[in-house]
């Protein structure tokens, strides 16, 4: 009874009106994205929508406020761009409506060239059905290395493009390798291919003069990385002499070590840094002398570890300038005198600061989404819980900013650590479980338009780095192998149970949503455990693991064994097909009893349109309600602003009908999107509910109950960064003591 007046007051507060953030503010292209500094620090480049809404490249003077548009594409938005060693010359990429067959162009962005012909560009690759990639660009040579799968769609040949003369020359004809690694002089030093057991085998050219083919007799084995170590093992770069290599190595370690060794003798490795709590994230290397400057780890929030004391004063100044944020260096000039810096924060969009080392001063240079400044955004809280098999799982919770919170004195003793973190609302919330894609990826801390939108509409958001995710060690990543639709799904269920047990979520008001693997998980949730979720939104998710494996893009064939390890079976034998079928939602579509929305891009090369078509057809055959949005000009996800705003308008209306959150008025077609909308009626809902009881009885045997109120393991420190002083870096000196 003591808490009753408080709860009544909180309920009154919760029903108070909030300012709805318009979808146009959240899902239009940001004013500034892909921000980078030119090598000479004179210009800052960025991608932004032009007056017609097409994403183009702009530049802004770094010492003044003058900005100008430098590309003038009228149909396809620019995906990305890079500076080159030639002043005023950039390369940029596009694709055809999301098909991921990337095209590459060179553009002279000087004022003189644009005045002469603003649309002029040099084609490097725009062949149909060819995926071109920028492989290596050292910002010193006039040459850039380009990869093109122009002969074999599964393999990329290597070409050298001269940014001065526009000459494109074949460097290596590839018949074998999926990955190449280059030194600072753009020489091919390593290549890799999958071994028979999914291990990664690195090769080096037999001759010091390099190789022009991939014939067996021209390459010798260099390193063999076992499959269990692949998730945290990778080459980073060469030192200035090209005689030593930096790697992150996973052998003998769950989180990995940053090491350096002579290229001629990889067994003579020296450990420079041992990861403490999370995998090593970014490795910051000096642009010219190639010495190690710093490393980052990201558990809940990024933490920075400094390796070079000449770098210390700069970083300490930047950390102190905004101690509540997590500092990140976005870009550096080639002489390292000028930096672009930003800070990760969940409750404000990214601001870009220009830092000049010679005067130790940073100034606000641009705000990526200034129109959001007037709104109150959510806070994102990192925490851990234990899954039913005792595996520690990291997750994030974002609550609506208007939701009143309970103090630690108002909750049971066991919940006080969570209340201290700001995780316990006065009343349980409507909740969206937002499942990341990959699945070899992770959710991160920081501003997200998706989180800002959902929490603004009155939903809490739960993001789970379930087993199979990356960033938390190879044990967690490898624990997902073969567990699609099983333990990876159980982790999501356990996270929901945790939220309900702590009073964070109302059990009857939990929805699930995600893209790619997250879309698959949504379909799994609504077919295998529909009683847990009120509704679901699947965005480009596969429904059939058999057809997913059959239809992988050709340029993924070099990683096929890794995919087979992930999904846990192959289609080459009947036992494998049965295993995949048993975890494919398509074959259990008649179990769906809750509202479902499916969103698909017609040009998706990863998850084909057939994945969604066949699931919708199965629902239609069983008279089960579904809303299907098909975008004929999109690929693996919805990118175009008019389509994105339309998509989120549909999702918002769908969630409001399911859970009752806030909405901004919406009419289909108001954004002039390309969406083709198909809705199947509700007459089959009763039939589907009858099928559910059988499904529940079958699936319940697979669901051993775990603890529903896991203990807290780690509270993020108040500090934004941890800075460690270290000796001047030398390529063979240990920088940090290895901690046991």
Swiss-Prot record:
Disulfide bonds: 535-658
Main location: membrane
Alphabetized GO MF terms: aminopeptidase activity; serine-type endopeptidase activity
Keyword set, alphabetical order: Aminopeptidase, Cell membrane, Disulfide bond, Glycoprotein, Hydrolase, Membrane, Protease, Serine protease, Signal-anchor, Transmembrane, Transmembrane helix
Origin superkingdom: Eukaryota
Subcellular location: Cell membrane
GO cellular component: plasma membrane
EC number: 3.4.14.-
Membrane topology: Single-pass type II membrane protein
Ranges of the Lumenal topological domain: 23-740
One family name in Pfam for this protein: Peptidase_S9
Main function: Removes N-terminal dipeptides sequentially from polypeptides. Essential for control of distal tip cell migration.
Protein name: Dipeptidyl peptidase family member 6
Native source species: Caenorhabditis elegans
């Amino acid at each position: 009874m003591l808490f009753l007046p408080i709860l009544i007051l909180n309920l009154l507060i919760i029903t108070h009106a909030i300012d709805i953030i318009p979808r146009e503010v959240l899902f239009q292209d940001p004013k500034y994205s892909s921000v980078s500094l030119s090598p000479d620090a004179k210009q800052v480049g960025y991608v932004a929508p032009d007056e017609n809404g097409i994403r183009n490249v702009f530049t802004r003077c770094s010492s003044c406020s003058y900005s100008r548009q430098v590309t003038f594409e009228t149909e396809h938005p620019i995906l990305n761009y890079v500076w080159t060693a030639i002043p005023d010359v950039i390369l940029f990429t596009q694709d055809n409506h999301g098909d991921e067959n990337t095209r590459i162009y060179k553009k002279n962005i000087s004022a003189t060239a644009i005045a002469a012909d603003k649309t002029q560009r040099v084609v490097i690759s725009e062949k149909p059905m060819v995926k071109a990639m920028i492989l290596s660009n050292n910002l010193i040579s006039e040459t850039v290395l380009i990869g093109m799968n122009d002969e074999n769609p599964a393999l990329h040949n290597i070409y050298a493009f001269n940014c001065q003369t526009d000459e494109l020359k074949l460097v290596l004809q590839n018949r074998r390798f999926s990955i190449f690694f280059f030194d600072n002089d753009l020489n091919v030093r390593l290549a890799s291919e999958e071994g028979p057991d999914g291990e990664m085998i690195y090769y080096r050219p037999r001759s010091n003069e390099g190789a022009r083919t991939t014939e067996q007799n021209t390459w010798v084995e260099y390193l063999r990385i076992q499959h269990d170590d692949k998730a945290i093992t990778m080459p980073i770069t060469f030192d200035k002499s090209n005689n030593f290599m930096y790697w992150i190595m996973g052998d003998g370690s769950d989180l990995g070590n940053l090491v350096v060794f002579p290229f001629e003798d990889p067994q003579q490795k020296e450990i420079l840094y041992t990861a403490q709590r999370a995998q090593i994230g970014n490795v910051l290397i000096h642009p010219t002398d190639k010495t190690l400057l710093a490393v980052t780890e990201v558990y809940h929030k990024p933490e920075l570890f400094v390796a070079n004391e000449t770098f210390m004063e700069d970083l300490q100044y930047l950390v102190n300038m905004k101690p509540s944020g997590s500092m990140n260096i976005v870009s550096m000039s080639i002489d390292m005198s000028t930096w672009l810096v930003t800070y990760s924060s969940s409750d404000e969009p990214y601001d870009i600061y220009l830092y000049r080392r010679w005067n130790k001063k940073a100034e606000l240079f641009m705000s990526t989404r200034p129109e959001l400044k007037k709104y109150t955004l959510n806070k994102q809280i990192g925490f851990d819980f234990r899954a039913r098999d005792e595996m520690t799982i990291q997750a994030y919770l974002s609550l609506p900013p208007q939701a009143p919170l309970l103090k630690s004195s108002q909750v049971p003793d066991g919940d006080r650590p969570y209340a201290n973190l700001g995780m316990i609302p006065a009343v349980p919330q409507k909740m969206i479980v937002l499942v990341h894609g990959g699945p070899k990826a992770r959710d991160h801390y920081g501003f997200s338009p998706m989180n800002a939108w959902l929490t603004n509409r009155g939903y809490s958001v739960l993001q789970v780095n379930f087993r199979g995710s990356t960033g938390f060690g190879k044990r967690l990543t490898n624990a997902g192998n073969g567990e699609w639709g099983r333990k990876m799904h159980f982790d999501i269920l356990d996270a929901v149970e945790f939220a309900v047990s702590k009073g964070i979520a109302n059990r009857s008001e939990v929805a699930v949503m995600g893209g790619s693997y997250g879309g698959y998980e949504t379909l799994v949730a609504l077919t295998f455990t529909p009683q847990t979720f009120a509704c679901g939104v699947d965005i480009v998710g596969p429904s059939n693991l058999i057809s997913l494996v059959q239809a992988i893009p050709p340029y993924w064939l070099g990683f096929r064994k890794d995919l087979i390890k992930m999904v846990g079976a192959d289609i080459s034998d009947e036992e494998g097909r049965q295993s995949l079928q048993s975890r494919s939602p398509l074959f259990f579509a008649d179990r769906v009893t809750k509202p479902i929305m499916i969103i698909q891009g017609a040009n998706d090369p990863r998850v084909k349109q057939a994945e969604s078509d066949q699931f919708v057809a199965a629902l239609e055959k069983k008279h089960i309600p579904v809303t299907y949005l098909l975008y004929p000009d999109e690929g693996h996800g919805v990118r175009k602003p008019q389509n994105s705003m339309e998509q989120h308008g549909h999702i918002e209306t769908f969630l409001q009908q399911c859970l009752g959150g806030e909405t901004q008025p919406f009419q289909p077609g108001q954004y002039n999107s390309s969406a083709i909308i198909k809705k199947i009626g509700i007459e089959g809902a009763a039939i589907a509910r009858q099928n559910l009881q059988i499904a529940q009885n079958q699936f319940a045997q697979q669901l051993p109950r775990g603890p529903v109120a896991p203990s807290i393991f780690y509270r993020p420190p108040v500090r934004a960064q941890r800075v460690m002083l270290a000796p001047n870096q030398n390529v063979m000196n240990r920088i940090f003591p290895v901690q046991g």
